[in-house]
Amino acid sequence: MRITARAWGKINLHLGVGPAREDGYHELVTVFQTIDLAETITLTTLEDELVEEGSVVRQLTVTGPRGVPTTPDNLAWRAVDALVGRRREHDRTPLPAVELHIDKGIPVAGGMAGGSADAAAALRAVDAWIGPFGEETLLEVAAELGSDVPFCLLGGTKLGTGRGEQLVDMLSRGTYHWALVVSPKGLSTPEVFAKFDEMSLPSSMDVTPMSQALLDGSAGALAEVLENDLAPAALSLRPDLRKTQLAGLRAGALATMVSGSGPTIALLCDDAQSARDVADALMDEGVGLSVHPATSPVPGPAKNRGAHIVSIESE
C-alpha cells in the first residue's frame, strides 16, 4: 500500500509572547494562517516484513533541501511511531514495516513549520493506514510532537494559545500575498526566546486589532496590525535581517515582519503580481538565499486546508 498525504506551512500574523512558564515554555497568543507551500509525505508498506515491537519505519528519504534528518529524530518518523504506539495500547497485531519519503516544498529552518507539516502529514497517512483514530487522538499526539503540529493538522486561520497548540477558529475574509525571504543562515529558536527574556520585551497578547483586520479582508488593514514580539530579539541576534526588510519595502512590499522566530522575513504585498515582482526584485539584488511568493490562507475545500490525504494506492 502507498499512501500520500500533504500539509501546508504556516505564517504567524500575530505572535504575542508572555513570560516563561514553569515547564520552560512561554505562554503564547498567536494567529496562524496556512501558506500555500507544502510538504508531501508518502508512506509505503513493506508487506513481507512484519514488526511486532519497536519502530515500523525502515527508511526515510527526502527530496528537496539538504540538512533534513533522515533518522528516528525526524518529526515525521516520530509521528509514525507515536500513532503506532497508540494502536499497540489496545491491539498488538504485528504491522508491516514502512518506508517514508518526504518531498519538501517548505524551506528548511525558516520559521514556517516545515517539520511540523511533515509530522501532520505523517499522522494523516498513518490514520488512513491503520486508523481511524479520531480527531481528538490525532490532535493529542500532534501536541505531544510539537507546538505547531496541531495547527498544521487542521490548517486554515486559527487563534493559538498555551504553547500555540490550543486552537480556535478565526474568521478571515481576505486572501493575502507574500514574498518570503529565506536566509542562508539559520537562527536557533531557543536562542531567540532566551534573548527575548534577556531584553525584557513587552508582550502583545491582545488580538482584537488582528481580528478586525482579518474581518476587513484587505491587505492594507492587515499591514497595519502585523505583530511579532520575537522580532526585536531575532533582529538583535541577526542585525543583517533589517537590510532584508528595508530591501523588501524598497521593492514595493506593504509591510514586513520576521516570520515566527526567524530568520525568514515575510513581506506582505498588494496582490499576487506585486508579490512576484517583489520576489523577482530581491532575487535580482541577491537578497537572501531564496525568495518564495506565497498566498495565505490556502484556498479550496475545508478538508484540504489542513493535512490531508492526496492518494491511496493498493499494490
From Swiss-Prot:
Pfam family, one: GHMP_kinases_C
Keywords: ATP-binding, Isoprene biosynthesis, Kinase, Nucleotide-binding, Transferase
Chain segments carrying region Disordered: 292-315
Reaction catalysed by this enzyme: 4-CDP-2-C-methyl-D-erythritol + ATP = 4-CDP-2-C-methyl-D-erythritol 2-phosphate + ADP + H(+)
Catalytic site positions: 10, 148
InterPro entries: GHMP_kinase_C_dom (IPR013750), GHMP_kinase_C_sf (IPR036554), GHMP_kinase_N_dom (IPR006204), IspE (IPR004424), Ribosomal_Su5_D2-typ_SF (IPR020568), Ribsml_uS5_D2-typ_fold_subgr (IPR014721)
Assigned protein family: Belongs to the GHMP kinase family. IspE subfamily.
Protein's recorded name: 4-diphosphocytidyl-2-C-methyl-D-erythritol kinase
Species name: Corynebacterium efficiens (strain DSM 44549 / YS-314 / AJ 12310 / JCM 11189 / NBRC 100395)
Gene this protein is translated from: ispE
